[in-house]
Amino acid sequence: METAIEQLRKLVIEGKESIPNRGVRTFTLLQELTFIENRKQVDYFLAMHRYVKELTSMPDALIGPGHRWMTASHVCHALGITNICLGSISLTPIDFWGDEDSDTTMDIEVDEDTYDWAYFKATEVFGYDNVARTSDIDNIQSEEEINTFRGYRKKQKGYSIVVCPDGVAEHYKVYEVEGDDGLDTLCIDGDVEPTDNIHIFRFNVIRSDTLTRIKRIQHEIVKAGKVCPDMYHRGSANILYYSNGYQTLFDEEDRSIPFLGDKLAKEMAEILFGKITSMEDLLTITALYSARLIYEIQVHNIEDYKKKHGVVRLFDKWRFPYGFLYREDVCWFMTGWIGMTWKESARIVQLMSGQNPLEAECLKHVYLHRGMDNGFREDELNHIWSSLFDRATKRPLPSMAHFVGSMYQYAFLAMLKKDFPEEYQSIKG
């Protein structure tokens, strides 16, 4: 009989073989599997695989392509939990490698129609007495996920599903809510502290109006007798990275695709790229836009500044640490050029916030030695290190993983807008 880790490894390898163009790396998969096994979270990933497989099998459900750290996980991609083409983006599971206490709770983004049904599907998979949901949480916000599209933070509604294999009532005070349709819901009374995802599993369900709009446009495409692209099908997902549909994102008259209709974002696109050809290009614009806007909000009244200067200029004041836009950029530089291990590189990124300066100093010595061994001058290395650790703000660099899920959805909307303009216009944002 197979052990749990053997089952997980088998599923991961089978999933990897179905991903075209070497979209996941074997080395990264093995590193992640070791991390998962050491953290005793094999059962959690197996449970998540079962649950998402059942969710995506629902005929009218639209599940997001991935959210937060999950989009950087090669294991999640191999299991079919996420649908971001990792081979086209330099995503690495920094949160896994840099911090052994990192929170691995998975977020599932769903359309509005599927939002409540996600709980009932969990009861089918794990059993009614073993599953309970928390009350709705409005205005979900994350300090690490500052999606400053048009100057405001992204706000969403969600709830948590808690799974206890030995019964939820053994661990929490619960009560039943009778539904109008005769389906009862088991709810947890009060707040739920973070779980370890070892003995008690937790999944966050997030309601997405963007996914709802995509689904309604897809319905209109089918009604018109046309072939509708499937956002969650791997073969269809890759066309986003080669389609000129990106250009339709930058339409000042269309405010229904957040952030990308903004004049500042369009200006950045025109400055940086003659033609946007990859998700990497969009992520570059997103990082520059967000950082620039944060700076202006902190230093100026953004509206007064726009009135005075016409537009918010991109490069006149903001300085990124040695040109690094994302945490992933720092990790790739540290490993590829300096010779640090992935775990050391990820830890450097986490220490940039100013915590544990003694540990940072120890890593700096290792960094200097390896950098000079690879041909860098000491003054160059010190300059790069200073740009990371001596910044005026200790706000952490953003992660691609925290932006790419939203960018993917907006790019998919742009593709629908280009290829199916009538159906797109029939569903207003």
Each predicted region: which residue ranges?
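Helix-rich "cap/lid" substructures immediately adjacent to catalytic or cofactor-binding pockets
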Residues: 20-65
